[in-house]
Amino acid sequence: MSALECKELYFLLDSAGAMSAYQEKDASWAGLLAFSSEDRARDFCSESGAQAREIVALPTSDRASVAALIRQVKARAIRYLLLDLDYRRGRCIQVEFEGDDFGEAKERQFVPPAAR
């Protein structure tokens, strides 16, 4: 599923209101965690132990807000979105940022925690 196929994207906020990102060890860039449903976001929190204080939704049809979000996270060395990261299996969809919009989406496989 591409981020553009979702009507809304759900993001995890920490206690300071910052969005959660994932960065692999020794990687230069990080990925912004996003989910296609609130249930998937809650599942990730349960499986990973993430201390998300809040789950917020952003309609993908709100192009101005999507563009503003992408510009904001790029300033924090975040270069792509990780959609529906399955913490146990390490699978997700990586959606590249192209300018201030969503670009190419491709399947991504991380090393799951159990295999480390």
Give, region by region, the residue ranges found by the protein language model.
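Conserved NAD+-utilizing ADP-ribose enzyme module
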Residues: 1-116
